[in-house]
Amino acid sequence: MREPEDELATLHQEGLLRSLRSGLSSDQLLSTSDGLPVVNFSSNDYLGLSRDEALVNAACEATGRYGTGAGASRLISGSLLPHRDLEERIAEWKGTEAALTFANGYATAMGALGAFLTSGDVVIMDKLCHACLIDGARRSGATLRIFPHNNLDKLENLLGHYRKKISENSRLLVVTESVFSMDGDRAPLAEIVDLVEKYDALLLLDEAHAVGILGSGGQGLAEELGLQDRIALQMGTLGKAVGSAGGYLAASRAWINLLTNKARPFIYSTAPPPAQAAASLCGIDIIASSRGVELRDRLWSNISRLSELLGKQPASAIIPVILGDNEMALRASATLLEKGYLAPAIRFPTVPRGSARLRITLSAGHREEAVVGLHQSLLNVS
């Protein structure tokens, strides 16, 4: 029988062993467990809302009124007013008839793909989609096909092949992200939507890293391109730019009713705490307000500045510095930490083998001197 120590030793030899880093706050200026001040360039709190006074107050007020937990699953007695209010707000914000929230983004993907797909269906997915989407597709029982990253020709070939092959009642689903989590680049969304419509398929778009950052009201890339009405299933997270926790799917009333009845992570989990829902609602309201515009402007100023310094085209708040070798990425991360910058090494299986990197993420909370200082330190490690 395999012993856990043997597996851990193998991970260590391959430079893939991970451990938890304790003693950190989620603010942009934080302390390591050794008490050394560092600037966080690894957080997905893109607008700095997770410590915003308004969100904290909303969470505290909801806790005082509803308690610390929901006490049951949503379909039993755990569906509280903050959950309803949040879902109605998400639907309004995303331009859909309805929305359903989950405890986190992983549960959202597992629930949606498991609810909507079964044996006989086909799901076609971008190679760089997040693990939650891949896992959800694999567990659904549907046929999973992967197309090379953002390769429209291969996508069309697969759509054409399976549209002819599957039965009339089977579903043909395309899955992609608007902003990819490890590379920070965008999907050619308009072209993908055209192909989905051409072959009478469905599109599930994960906007996890676009919500709050793109779009006139922070709704994401679909809204920025005027495509919301043409996308059946819009998925997102509440734990990144929104500043809280959880995930959601926004769609037609029929899709959401089906999800409510068939999504196992939703049915068999205690509802998220009411404080989480209240903070999420507050975060969305801020993102959609004039203050949200100001925060996005500050964020994009930081994105543009670091992109310019690194000679890259600004696309999102995620800027990878690809080093290739695991040990090289670990050493680079350790060197940056010594200089006061937190940018953990990202390695396989999060990214493909041979593409270990520093995944730099920017926030509206970063000051320009920190961005410039990070760049100077990167010159010595990359």
Where are these regions (language model features)?
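Conserved PLP-anchoring active-site segment centered on the Schiff-base-forming lysine
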Residues: 112-131, 302
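PLP-dependent enzyme catalytic core of the Aspartate aminotransferase-like
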Residues: 53, 57, 61, 65, ...
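Conserved PLP-binding catalytic core of the aspartate aminotransferase-like
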Residues: 293-340, 350, 354-355, 362-364
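Active-site phosphate-binding strand-loop segment of PLP-dependent enzymes
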Residues: 45, 145, 149-205
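Conserved N-terminal alpha-helix of the aminotransferase class I/II PLP-enzyme fold
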Residues: 57, 61-104
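N-terminal "arm"/small-domain region of PLP-dependent enzymes with the aminotransferase-like
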Residues: 2-68, 201
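PLP-dependent aminotransferase class I/II
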Residues: 235-237, 241-313
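Conserved active-site segment immediately N-terminal to the catalytic lysine
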Residues: 200, 219-238, 256-261
